Amino acid sequence: MEKNIYHCPLCNYRGELLSFRGRPYAQCPNCLSLERHRFQYQILQKVLHDKNTKLMHALHFAPEPGLKAFFNHRFAKYVTADIAMSDVDINIDIQALPFADETFDFVFASHVLEHIPDDHKALFEIRRILKPQGMAILPVPIVVASTIEYPEPDPLQDNHVRAPGLDYYERYADYFSSCQFYSSEEVDAECQPFVYIGENYSHPLRVDECQMKDIIPVCYR
């Protein structure tokens, strides 16, 4: 049987990928990156390639190990943050950030806002601490057509307080001057940026009978 060989851009591994939570071809066995991490890495390379990041200050919420290493070597100042994680620089609530206005050039918070009760307050705070022309990358898992707000955190969904829909990113227009959206279909398929789903699973970002794409919003103050 022919093997599916992929390339992980985060660690340069080349070979088969592991299943993760029932999703085939999901996890790199070397650095443990998932589909979204490999997709995000390629978009980060694209949007940062013409930036002098050695002069930029960055804030990274809920830092992913592979991306943490990438950011740490790139930015002049790099701060990791989370409300509960112990191995970060500072424990803070994204709804009430302790930083002065216009502190950071770059903010990265992936799969964070679906956990935040007042995501509008969080978006306000992110914009507040961004410098003029600052950039924020704020992807969430799009799982339905229209966003559903839960009355309380759902323990079966890692305590998500909402199911983000195709309309979710419309909220960003109230806080940022512009947003660019990137799709899994725009990057090298060899990194395997798609999520494999069952044939009977309805998803608004399905691209064929077994794959769904992801979307990354890159927001500018």
Language model: regions and residue ranges:
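Hydrophobic adenine-recognition pocket in adenosine-nucleotide-binding enzymes
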Residues: 109-112, 142
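Conserved N-terminal segment of class I S-adenosyl-L-methionine
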Residues: 1-98, 190-193, 209-218
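S-adenosyl-L-methionine-dependent methyltransferase catalytic module, highlighting the catalytic core
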Residues: 117-127, 131-221
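Hydrophobic beta-strand segment of the Class I
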Residues: 99, 107-108
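A mid-sequence, solvent-exposed acidic-amphipathic segment
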Residues: 93-96, 111, 116-117, 126
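Short, well-ordered alpha-helix to beta-strand connector turns
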Residues: 55, 75-76, 104, 126, ...
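Structural alpha-helical scaffold elements that stabilize or flank donor/cofactor-binding regions
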Residues: 99-100, 122
